[in-house]
């Protein structure tokens, strides 16, 4: 068995959540959150910010850590267990541009009820639900949007 670690972001701007549409030779299609593998020497925060920037061309800021998800998949002659660390993030605008080299063909910001139905994977739906609840709590107490640095 192979163990792998990735990091990603639930990016929210003005109440809408960033998602990417991936299409790889018609074998894999669906809306996903930006995430990717930790590179040597990187922290989880650095990985999450880099992946959001690379996959969606979004300058984001970390708000807080929101948890991790785990899933398994198979590769030829082995099983991979992947742990993904997720961060709630904010962006300073609605701009996004999908990374074609990674087979992303569309991207955009969607309302919670829209993205919840668009996302392909149930573990990402759960993370979005948790992140959105955090966002609503922070917004209601006036903490959302305070002192964020965009990377």
Residue ranges and their predicted role:
Residues 1-33:
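N-terminal strand-loop-strand
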Residues 126-132:
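A small-molecule sensor/coupling module
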Residues 1, 26, 30-32, 64-78, ...:
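Charged, low-complexity, helix/coiled-coil-prone segments
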Residues 8, 13-18, 45, 65, ...:
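A generic structural signal for ordered secondary structure
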Residues 38-126, 149-151:
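Unchanged
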Residues 139-151:
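Long, compositionally biased
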């Amino acid at each position: 068995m192979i163990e792998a670690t990735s990091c990603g972001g639930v990016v929210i701007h003005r109440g809408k959540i960033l998602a990417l549409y991936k299409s790889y030779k018609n074998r894999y299609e669906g809306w996903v959150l930006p995430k990717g593998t930790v590179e040597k020497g990187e922290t989880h925060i650095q990985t999450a910010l880099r992946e959001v920037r690379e996959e969606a061309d979004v300058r984001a800021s970390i708000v807080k850590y929101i948890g991790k998800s785990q899933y398994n998949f198979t590769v030829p002659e082995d099983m991979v267990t992947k742990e993904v660390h997720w961060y709630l993030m904010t962006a300073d605008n609605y701009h996004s541009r999908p990374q074609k080299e990674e087979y992303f063909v569309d991207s955009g910001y969607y309302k919670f009820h829209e993205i919840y139905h668009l996302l392909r994977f149930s573990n990402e739906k759960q993370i979005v639900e948790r992140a959105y609840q955090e966002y609503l709590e922070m917004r209601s107490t006036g903490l959302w949007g305070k002192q964020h640095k965009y990377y």
